[in-house]
Amino acid sequence: TDYLLCGICLLWMTGCSNMLDEMRPKDKIPQDALSESDLTKLLNGVYAEMEELVFKFYMDGDVKGENFKAGPGFSMNDPMSMAPSSKEVLGQWQKCFTALKQVNFLVETYEASSNKDSQVVKQTGGTGYYFRALIYYHLVTRWGGAPILRKRTYDVVPISPEADVWNFIKEDLGKAESLLPEFTDRFYVSLSVCDALNAKVCLALKDYTNAAIYADRVITKSNFALSTTSAEYANAFISNSNSKELIFALANKRSTGLLLFYQSVNDIDPTWDYSPSADCYSHLYADTSCLLYTSD
């Protein structure tokens, strides 16, 4: 009896093994099996990836515009140099494409969806197209031409001319514009942030007429207003800000996040990287006299 029972159990286990091998997912959810609940989690993951990308570029304009001075922990790059030998420059290029891989997964998921009328699916597509346009905006404004990747690939893709990259950005923003909802929360991509990037793209291309049109779409909304004092302007950069200048912001928590701006930009730590230059302090506000800061 024992031998018979063991034989039956062995037969049952080997018979089921093939069925178990064919079950999905083994270690992840297949792209074609993502539910709307899964898409929400996927969106959150892409937001986290984009936070790292934005962190890479957040201070770049100030560094290259010489608003900062270099500290003992870092040597300032020549603002006219974009040499690949620079660790910072190479890191920015690489981060664009690691983030692009995740964003393209989002875009591919939207494009393959059979339920494009769903608000969650629309948000997925609109966010993906916007983030891809933002990535390529960072690329084209620094390097000009860049490889255009509409889908994830490990193939070597040649660099496209700068004009083609700008056209790709405008194409993606057009798609995002048709999918994104109106502004409700600064921590989520909305139609307003798409309009804001469209305005920057038009400015870069010297299309001033359309730049003004896109900018007006944002400025004329009651959700937003320009700061009128230095204190109001500074309020945009603090935690839990209620500034009406904020159109889109990625949530960065010092308590849980690893991306800490104060570790790079301060003049207190022994190995600080950057701090604002004296000229930056003295010319930042028209009403500088009302501030407690000094340029020392």
Predicted regions and their residues:
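Elongated scaffold/linker segments in the mid-to-C-terminal portions of large proteins
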Residues: 87, 223-295
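Conserved, well-structured interaction surfaces
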Residues: 40, 73-142, 156-160, 178-181
